[in-house]
């Protein structure tokens, strides 16, 4: 099987289970694995008014532990990991799985797509906050080592982040092999320092009893509700377990969770709780104060490495979601570079990378500390949790055929928990929660504007197109001069004559001896099997209609797709094949459709979209692009 036939995520499945578990530690668990850096510090932030008492500390640790057990272990590891879409996970895969189950109800199908698109848009907000809060919280450990380094925390954070984003264009294939071993050292360190500190206040193990979590909520009332907005930070990154399922498979992710990550996180949170019971003043930075003074600089270095790895996973996820959104028709084409010759899933999108870096630096410099950023973190995460739980209902009911009542009960249980966390984080909108919401809302608005604009453009082109059948019949009545070679006309409308063909005939008065009308369609599925990639329909006068199908995670390569026509008797010689593309120049006009300013935004996106020839891997010296003005 060639590289183009192999789905990018499935090549890892041939590796031994132990290596897959190690790789999963380095990719999947970076985000949730670095949460202990800031969760306890945020919960007991003086601004929240929660006192560092024994009952509160044990109650909070109990709340954190059971939140991890219910949200991560039960919802994601046990339930949602079963919802694989051709082996793939993530919100786009869950969206396509849920929406494909209600295709007979177009209105509901469209609503689900909008909900899923908003969830994907919020992921961009997460892509900003995660690198900012993770790296900043790690570097803040220098303040614990010596207060004299406090003025250097922000500059060091900025330098680390700039270096991280500059690395993206080179790819992480070389150093990526170190991610797993580094995270193993990280999780072992988490568990070890936690265990050592538990010995100083063993009564903290009472937190395993969920009654302490309930008692904390009842006795503290409003303060407990506010604390939920910080407790939820302990499960940020939990969605990565599902998002990265296509790379590693469900079994290695489950084994890595129960065999390494969950015990390490549990011991570390218990250790922080024990430290606070023994020394309430340690709330200034309970994570780094777990370490002996001689190990602080090493701990800061290790934490920085772990947060860089966590950030790398999120950045790669943003690139992946961007490409999926492009192929599902939610975003304009962008320049996509491949950073690995062996794994086609490793991509780099320059525009997204530098835009993301700019906004991340704004977040770091604007919020100034991990405590301030924590207020901005939870809103996008809890909104995504609510969306994924909602989509899961449709999988339970219509894909797995659960009884309606059982589907409602399961969904209601998780929605009640997600909604409690969501409500608590909404309280922080004014303190910074607005930041990821604004990012997500702007991206969502761009997505629906592009999707609506493309539909308007396609509808207009269909309405003015000459029917293909009539055109072919006219070739018999008035045959043009035919020249040697093959012409391939890309068209979104398989029933109409492409504008590029009409322009070519009008100006050159010739037609190639073989003409192909090629339409690319993207399915609501991650991968399309290679045997289903193409369909060929012979037309009259040596003309053919070819449809190429891709999934939203497939790599588009039209010359390779045309090679698949050889068993059907169609051979495309590269030096005798020319590709003709139409490039629409959109002219906004008042009237029906979108508001004029949205049409202008759409026109600007069309102008700045990357070249279709480059996107579809067409040979540059065999492409002719013809423009056409279109009013919408």
From Swiss-Prot:
What top-level branch of life does the organism fall under?
Bacteria
Gene Ontology molecular functions: potassium ion transmembrane transporter activity; symporter activity
**Keyword list, A-Z:** Cell inner membrane, Cell membrane, Ion transport, Membrane, Potassium, Potassium transport, Symport, Transmembrane, Transmembrane helix, Transport
User: By its UniProt entry, which Pfam families does this protein fall under?
Assistant: K_trans, K_trans_C
**Keyword Cell membrane attached:** yes
Reactions catalysed, semicolon-separated, are:
K(+)(in) + H(+)(in) = K(+)(out) + H(+)(out)
**InterPro entries per record:** K+_transporter, K_trans_C, K_trans_N, Kup
Q: How does it sit in the membrane?
A: Multi-pass membrane protein
Q: Does the keyword Ion transport apply?
A: yes
Where found, per UniProt? Cell inner membrane
Q: Where are the transmembrane segments?
A: 19-39, 57-77, 111-131, 147-167, 175-195, 213-233, 257-277, 286-306, 347-367, 376-396, 404-424, 429-449
Q: What does this protein do?
A: Transport of potassium into the cell. Likely operates as a K(+):H(+) symporter.
Q: Which family does it belong to?
A: Belongs to the HAK/KUP transporter (TC 2.A.72) family.
What's this protein's name? Probable potassium transport system protein Kup
């Amino acid at each position: 099987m060639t590289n183009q036939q192999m789905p990018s995520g499935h090549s890892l499945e041939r590796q031994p289970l132990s290596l897959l578990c190690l790789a999963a530690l380095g990719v999947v668990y970076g985000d949730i694995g670095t949460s202990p850096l800031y969760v306890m510090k945020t919960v007991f932030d003086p601004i929240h008014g929660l006192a560092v008492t024994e009952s509160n500390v044990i109650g909070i640790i109990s709340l954190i532990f059971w939140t991890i057990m219910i949200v991560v272990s039960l919802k994601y590891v046990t339930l949602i990991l079963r919802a694989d879409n051709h082996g793939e996970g993530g919100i786009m895969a869950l969206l396509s799985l849920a929406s494909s189950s209600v295709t007979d109800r177009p209105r509901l199908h469209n609503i689900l797509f909008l909900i899923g698109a908003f969830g994907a848009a919020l992921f961009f907000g997460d892509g900003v906050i995660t690198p900012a809060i993770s790296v900043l919280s790690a570097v803040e450990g220098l303040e614990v080592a010596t207060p004299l380094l406090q003025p250097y925390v922000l500059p060091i954070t900025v330098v680390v982040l700039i270096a991280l984003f500059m690395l993206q264009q080179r790819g992480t294939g070389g150093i990526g092999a170190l991610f797993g071993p580094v995270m193993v050292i990280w999780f072992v360190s988490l568990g070890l320092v936690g265990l050592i500190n538990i010995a100083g206040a063993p009564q903290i193990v009472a937190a395993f009893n969920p009654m302490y979590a309930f008692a904390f909520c009842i006795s503290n009332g409003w303060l407990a509700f506010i604390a939920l907005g910080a407790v939820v930070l302990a499960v940020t990154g939990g969605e990565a377990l599902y998002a990265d399922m296509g790379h590693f498979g469900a079994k290695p992710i489950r084994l890595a969770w129960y065999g390494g990550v969950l015990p390490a996180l549990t011991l570390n949170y218990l250790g922080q709780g024990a430290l606070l019971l023994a020394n309430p003043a340690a709330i200034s930075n309970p994570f780094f104060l777990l370490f002996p003074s001689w190990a602080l600089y090493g701990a800061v270095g290790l934490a920085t490495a772990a947060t860089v790895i966590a950030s790398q996973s999120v950045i790669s996820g943003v690139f992946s979601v961007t490409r999926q959104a492009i192929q599902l028709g939610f975003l304009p084409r962008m320049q996509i570079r491949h950073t690995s010759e062996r794994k086609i899933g490793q991509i780099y999108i320059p525009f997204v990378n530098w835009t993301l870096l700019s906004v991340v630096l704004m977040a770091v410099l604007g919020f100034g500390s991990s405590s301030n950023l924590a207020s901005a973190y939870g809103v996008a995460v809890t909104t995504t949790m609510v969306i994924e739980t909602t989509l899961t209902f449709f999988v339970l009911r219509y894909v797995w055929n659960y009884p309606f009542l059982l589907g409602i009960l399961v969904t209601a249980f998780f929605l009640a928990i997600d909604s409690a966390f969501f409500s608590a984080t909404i309280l922080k909108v004014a303190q910074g929660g607005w930041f990821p919401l604004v990012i997500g809302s702007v991206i969502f608005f761009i997505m629906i504007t592009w999707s609506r604009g493309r539909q308007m453009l396609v509808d207009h082109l269909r309405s003015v197109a000459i029917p293909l059948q009539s055109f072919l019949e006219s070739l018999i009545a008035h045959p043009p001069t035919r020249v040697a070679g093959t012409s391939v006309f890309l068209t979104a409308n398989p029933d109409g004559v492409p504008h590029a063909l009409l322009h070519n005939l009008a100006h050159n008065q010739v037609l190639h001896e073989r003409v192909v009308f090629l339409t690319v369609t993207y399915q609501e599925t991650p991968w399309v099997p290679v045997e289903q990639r193409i369909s060929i329909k012979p037309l009259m006068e040596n003309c053919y209609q070819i449809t190429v199908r891709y999934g939203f995670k497939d790599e588009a390569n039209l010359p390779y797709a045309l090679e698949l026509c050889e068993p059907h008797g169609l051979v495309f010689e590269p030096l005798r094949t020319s590709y003709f593309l139409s490039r629409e120049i959109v002219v906004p006009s008042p009237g029906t459709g979108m508001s004029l300013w949205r049409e202008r935004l759409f026109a600007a996106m069309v102008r700045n979209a990357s070249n279709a020839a480059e996107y579809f891997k067409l040979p540059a010296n065999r492409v002719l692009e013809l423009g056409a003005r279109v009013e919408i």
